[in-house]
C-alpha cells in the first residue's frame, strides 16, 4: 500500500478533499513525508485553522473519522512514529523555521502554510507597535473632551474614547447594547475638532447590512449633536464594506499598489463587526493602510468568527488584562487626573497589545432582569448549568419550546408563520415602504442549516404553504424558474456593484405605481428608496427564514431560533450566542433540550500562533 492509494481512499470516503489530494501529490509526489504534511496542514487550514500544532500529528488527531485502521496505516507509511521525522523535514526544501522561503514553516511547535505564517507575523508586529505619546497635544485634547464628557457616558466608555484618540490602533470590544456606536460618534467628533483641516475618514463593516446599520445609527444620533456645517459634511459620508474599501472581489487578484494609492491620505478607518475579519483580509489591510492611519476595530469576539481562516479578534483579545501599563496609565491620568479610575498592570509582557484593548461590559439595551441578557452573560462566562435552569422555566422575554415529532413540526410552522400577521396587515393597509420593512425586520426566524427539515429551504417552503392556506399569498408568478408573489421577502446572496446591491441586503416584493411587481430595498447612506423589476434581481433566496451566519451585523426586536434535531458540526456556543444577541426584546428557541445543551458545551476551536495561549484539544 502506498501513500497515494491511501489518500485516494480518503478522497472517496470524503475524509479529505480532491483538491487537497491533487495539490499535495503533484507538489511532493517523490517525498512521502512532505506529501503527508501537506495533506494534514491543508486539511486543517480548510477547516479555518491558521496552523497545525505538531502534537496533534503525534497523537493522530487530524482526521476525525471512524476509519481508524486507514488513518493508522497512513501514519505508518509516513513513518511519523519514528524519531527525527521533523528534523528530516527541516533538512529538506519542504519546510523551514522561517529563515528561508519554503512551502511550509515549522515555528513554535506549529506547522504553517508559508503565507499564513507570514501573515501572522505581520499581524503580531502590527498590533505590538509602540505608541509615541510625545506627538499628542494634551491641552487641546483636554479642552475638547471637557465638552464631550459632560454627556451621560460611563468611565469605561470615556477610556475607550481617550484610547482611540491617543492610540493609532484601538480594539473596542463589547456585546450588544454596550454603546459602541455612541462611542464612535464621540470619537469622530473629537478627531474632527482636533484636525483644523478636513479629516479623511472611512466607516466600514464586514457586511453590507452592518455597514448600512452603522450609517443609520450615526445619522440618527448626529441630530442630537450641536455640529457646524463643516462637521455635518464630514459625518454625512457613505459607509462601505471592508471588502469594497480594499477592492477584494471573488476571482480577482489583490492589487496592493492600487489599494495603497487609493488609501494613501486616509486619516481614520473604523471597522465594525471586526470579529468577522479573517487572517487574509487582516494581512491585506495592514499592507494597504498608511502607517499614520488611525484604525479603530469594533466587535464582539464571543460571536461567530469569519467563515475563512482564523479567529483574529479573539486571538488579539487573549492578551487583555483589565488595566494599562504604567506608561499609558500615567498619560491617561495626565489627561484626566482624579476623574477616571484606572488600574495599573505591572510587568505585562505584552503591554503594547493590552494597552490597545478596552472591554465594554455594561449593557444599555437590556435590563439586568432581561433573560436575553442573562443568557448572553451565561454564555460568555460559560455558566452552562445556569442556562439549563433557565431552559426549564417560563420567562417573559425568552421562551424555550421542545421539538419532538413530525406533528410537532407542523405546529411549529403554524406558530412561526402566524407571527408574520403584523407584516401582512401592514401590506393590506398599504403603509409606506419604510414602515412596512421596519415591521418585517422586527421579527426574524433564524436557523443554522441550508437543507433538511429545519434548514432555510424547507422552512421557507413550509411557511409559504401555510401562508397560502391562510390566504396571505394569493397570485403567484413564475419568472425564470423563480416563484414571485406580492409580499415575498428576499435576501441578496452576492455583491452586485452595478445594481448597488450587496450580500445580506433584504428586499420586499411590492407593487409599483403601475401595479407591477418590483423588489424594493432600503435606502443606503441617506439615498432614496430604490426598486428593481423582479426579472432583474441578482442571486437571492426567499427570506422568511435566514441562517444565523447571514444574520450577523443585524438586530431584530423578536427572534425565533430553530435548531435541528440532530447534532451537527456547526452547532456551537458561538453560534447560539450570535443568534441570542440578534434579539432586542423577545427570543423563542425551538430545540431538543439535549441538542441545545450539547451545543452550549461545544466551542469553536481555531489553532493559531497569534493567541497568547493556545489550548490543544484532543
Curated annotation (Swiss-Prot):
- Key word Transmembrane present in the record? no
**Catalytic activity field:** Couples ATP hydrolysis with the unwinding of duplex DNA at the replication fork by translocating in the 5'-3' direction. This creates two antiparallel DNA single strands (ssDNA). The leading ssDNA polymer is the template for DNA polymerase III holoenzyme which synthesizes a continuous strand; ATP + H2O = ADP + phosphate + H(+)
Top enzyme class, one word, equals isomerase
Q: Which GO terms describe its biological process?
A: double-strand break repair via homologous recombination
Checking Pfam families in the record gives: AAA_19, RecD_N, UvrD_C_2
In terms of superkingdom, the source organism counts as Bacteria
Q: What GO cellular component term, any one, is given?
A: exodeoxyribonuclease V complex
EC number in record: 5.6.2.3
Instruction: State the CDD domains in the record.
Output: DEXSc_RecD-like, SF1_C_RecD
Q: Which residues bind ATP?
A: 174-181
Keyword line: ATP-binding, DNA damage, DNA repair, DNA-binding, Exonuclease, Helicase, Hydrolase, Isomerase, Nuclease, Nucleotide-binding
Instruction: Write one Gene Ontology MF term.
Output: DNA binding
Q: Its biological function?
A: A helicase/nuclease that prepares dsDNA breaks (DSB) for recombinational DNA repair. Binds to DSBs and unwinds DNA via a highly rapid and processive ATP-dependent bidirectional helicase activity. Unwinds dsDNA until it encounters a Chi (crossover hotspot instigator) sequence from the 3' direction. Cuts ssDNA a few nucleotides 3' to the Chi site. The properties and activities of the enzyme are changed at Chi. The Chi-altered holoenzyme produces a long 3'-ssDNA overhang and facilitates RecA-binding to the ssDNA for homologous DNA recombination and repair.
User: Whom does it interact with, and what assembly results?
Assistant: Heterotrimer of RecB, RecC and RecD. All subunits contribute to DNA-binding.
Family that this chain belongs to: Belongs to the RecD family.
Additional information: In the RecBCD complex, RecB has a slow 3'-5' helicase, an exonuclease activity and loads RecA onto ssDNA, RecD has a fast 5'-3' helicase activity, while RecC stimulates the ATPase and processivity of the RecB helicase and contributes to recognition of the Chi site.
Which named protein is this? Answer: RecBCD enzyme subunit RecD
Amino acid at each position: 500500500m502506498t501513500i497515494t492509494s491511501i489518500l485516494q481512499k480518503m478522497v472517496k470516503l470524503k475524509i479529505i478533499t480532491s483538491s487537497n489530494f491533487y495539490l499535495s501529490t503533484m507538489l511532493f509526489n517523490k517525498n512521502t513525508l512532505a506529501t503527508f504534511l501537506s495533506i494534514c496542514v491543508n486539511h486543517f487550514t480548510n477547516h479555518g485553522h491558521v496552523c497545525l500544532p505538531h502534537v496533534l500529528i503525534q497523537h493522530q488527531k487530524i482526521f476525525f473519522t471512524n476509519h481508524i485502521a486507514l488513518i493508522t496505516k497512513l501514519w505508518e507509511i509516513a513513518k511519523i512514529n519514528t524519531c527525527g521525522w521533523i528534523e528530516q523535514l527541516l533538512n529538506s526544501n519542504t519546510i523551514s523555521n522561517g529563515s528561508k522561503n519554503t512551502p511550509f514553516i515549522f515555528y513554535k511547535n506549529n506547522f504553517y502554510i508559508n503565507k499564513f505564517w507570514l501573515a501572522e507575523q505581520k499581524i503580531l508586529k502590527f498590533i505590538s507597535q509602540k505608541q509615541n505619546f510625545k506627538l499628542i497635544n494634551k491641552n487641546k485634547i483636554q479642552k475638547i473632551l471637557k465638552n464631550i464628557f459632560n454627556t451621560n457616558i460611563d468611565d469605561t466608555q470615556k477610556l475607550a474614547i481617550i484610547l482611540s484618540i491617543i492610540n493609532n490602533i484601538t480594539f473596542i470590544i463589547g456585546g450588544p447594547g454596550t454603546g459602541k456606536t455612541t462611542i464612535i460618534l464621540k470619537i469622530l467628533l473629537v478627531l474632527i475638532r482636533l484636525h483644523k483641516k478636513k479629516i479623511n475618514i472611512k466607516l466600514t463593516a464586514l457586511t453590507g447590512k452592518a455597514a448600512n446599520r452603522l450609517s443609520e445609527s450615526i445619522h440618527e444620533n448626529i441630530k442630537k449633536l450641536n455640529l457646524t456645517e463643516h462637521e455635518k459634511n464630514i459625518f454625512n459620508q457613505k459607509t462601505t464594506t471592508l471588502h469594497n474599501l480594499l477592492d477584494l472581489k471573488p476571482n480577482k487578484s489583490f492589487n496592493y499598489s492600487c489599494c495603497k494609492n487609493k488609501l494613501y491620505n486616509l486619516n481614520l478607518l473604523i471597522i465594525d463587526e471586526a470579529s468577522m475579519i479573517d487572517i487574509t483580509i487582516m494581512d491585506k489591510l495592514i499592507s494597504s493602510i498608511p502607517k499614520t492611519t488611525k484604525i479603530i476595530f469594533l466587535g464582539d469576539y464571543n460571536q461567530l468568527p469569519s467563515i475563512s481562516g482564523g479567529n483574529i479578534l479573539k486571538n488579539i483579545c487573549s492578551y487583555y488584562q483589565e488595566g494599562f501599563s504604567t506608561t499609558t496609565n500615567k498619560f491617561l491620568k495626565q489627561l484626566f487626573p482624579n476623574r477616571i479610575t484606572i488600574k495599573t498592570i505591572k510587568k505585562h509582557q505584552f503591554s503594547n497589545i493590552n494597552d490597545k484593548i478596552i472591554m465594554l461590559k455594561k449593557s444599555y439595551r437590556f435590563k439586568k432582569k432581561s433573560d436575553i441578557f442573562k443568557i448572553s452573560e451565561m454564555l460568555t462566562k460559560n455558566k452552562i448549568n445556569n442556562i439549563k435552569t433557565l431552559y426549564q422555566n417560563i420567562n417573559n422575554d425568552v421562551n424555550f419550546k421542545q421539538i419532538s415529532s413530525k406533528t410537532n413540526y407542523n405546529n411549529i410552522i403554524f406558530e412561526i408563520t402566524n407571527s408574520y400577521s403584523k407584516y401582512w396587515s401592514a401590506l393590506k393597509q398599504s403603509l409606506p415602504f419604510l414602515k412596512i420593512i421596519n415591521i418585517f425586520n422586527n421579527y426574524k426566524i433564524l436557523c443554522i442549516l441550508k437543507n433538511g427539515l429545519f434548514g432555510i429551504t424547507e422552512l421557507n417552503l413550509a411557511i409559504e404553504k401555510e401562508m397560502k392556506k391562510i390566504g396571505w399569498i394569493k397570485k403567484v408568478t413564475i419568472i425564470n424558474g423563480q416563484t414571485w408573489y406580492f409580499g415575498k421577502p428576499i435576501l441578496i446572496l452576492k455583491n452586485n456593484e452595478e445594481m448597488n446591491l450587496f450580500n445580506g441586503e433584504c428586499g420586499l416584493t411590492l407593487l409599483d405605481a403601475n401595479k407591477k411587481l418590483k423588489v424594493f430595498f432600503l435606502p443606503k447612506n441617506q439615498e432614496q428608496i430604490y426598486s428593481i423589476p423582479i426579472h432583474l434581481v441578482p442571486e437571492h433566496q426567499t427570506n422568511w427564514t435566514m441562517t444565523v451566519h447571514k444574520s450577523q451585523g443585524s438586530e431584530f426586536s423578536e427572534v425565533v431560533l430553530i435548531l435541528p434535531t440532530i447534532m451537527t458540526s456547526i452547532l456551537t456556543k458561538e453560534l447560539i450566542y450570535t443568534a441570542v444577541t440578534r434579539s432586542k426584546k423577545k427570543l423563542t428557541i425551538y430545540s431538543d433540550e439535549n441538542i441545545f445543551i450539547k451545543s452550549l458545551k461545544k466551542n469553536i476551536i481555531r489553532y493559531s500562533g497569534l493567541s497568547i495561549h493556545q489550548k490543544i484539544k484532543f
